[in-house]
Amino acid sequence: MFRRIVAVPSSWSSLQLFSTSAVRSSNGLAAILEQVSAKKSAPREAKTPSKYADRKPQHSSPVRKKKVFVRWTTGSEKAREIANTVVSEVLSIRSDGRLRLILPEENRIQELSMQDVARQLDLEVHSLRFIKSETDAGGRPLPLVKRVSVREAFRVHAERMAAEREKELLRKGVSARRVGAKERRAPDSKQVRISWQISPTDFSNQKSKEIRGHLERGHTVLVLLANKDASGPAPQVSPRELQRRSSLLDELAAILEDINCSVVRSGDPASRVELKLVPKAPQEVDRHALKEQRRLQRAEKLKRRLERRGPASAQE
């Protein structure tokens, strides 16, 4: 006798849970389908947790922020130094350089970047002064800066440096009385700008007197000799013009010889020259030498008096 064999599909050949009775019965195919369905619906065993499950997700490297660079094309070295001090304060509060700028002449406040301020500002006329830190509409800090004259910027900087110097001396143990009023009220610096095209008359009657007056009052004077339009590149200078500029510098040096001050010169007559004039403190007089000098003067007077009386007494 031949047995009837039910062919099992190849996809089910790996199943070993089918009973022979289910295959022999007429409803064998339906039973197989039920068993397959039950096999699929059976709950899966929980997988073993991976050893990398507790590993923290790796974050991408932070995006580097672009640094703000400010380049000044006008003004003296001291004026640039003062402006860079304000730039450092702004960048310490707002790394992208955004700020609010007060324009007193125009009676308005403008919000712009530090680079825009540097492009618009002429350090030979104006400078910057840090006021305070505010917040913008999004709650981020926003520095408030005021455009001021160069003279005011020099004055504020001198007062600030004097205050810092006093604090440093006090920190080192020097008493406030020893610091003295001179340290607490350091004289402000004055800036005198002279054009290379100035006439000899204007130089002798105006600029030289202005420089002398500042030095006699104890102020440090910054003298800037440059072209009237110093924003662009320096033009080519002829030998005759160089000689005239050298004569102007010699005349200024002759004026400074009569004044007790130190002179620090930098620059080139072909473009611009900067002079830093610092008045020297008056030398202290030696009291013992002065006393000896007065004693000798009294002795000399007495000797002359006796000489005048000598002939008169002899005649008597």
Curated annotation (Swiss-Prot):
InterPro entries: AIM23 (IPR029427)
GO cellular-component term (any): mitochondrion
The keyword Repeat is annotated on this UniProt entry: no
Coiled coil regions, renumbered to chain: none
Superkingdom of this protein's organism: Eukaryota
Location of the region described as Disordered in the Swiss-Prot/TrEMBL record: 40-64, 297-316
Leader sequence residues: none
Subcellular location as annotated: Mitochondrion
Record: transit peptide: 1-12
Composition bias type Basic and acidic residues, residue spans: 42-57
Keyword annotations from UniProtKB, A to Z: Mitochondrion, Transit peptide
Family under the similarity heading: Belongs to the AIM23 family.
Protein name per its UniProtKB record: Altered inheritance of mitochondria protein 23, mitochondrial
Organism (species): Eremothecium gossypii (strain ATCC 10895 / CBS 109.51 / FGSC 9923 / NRRL Y-1056) (Yeast)
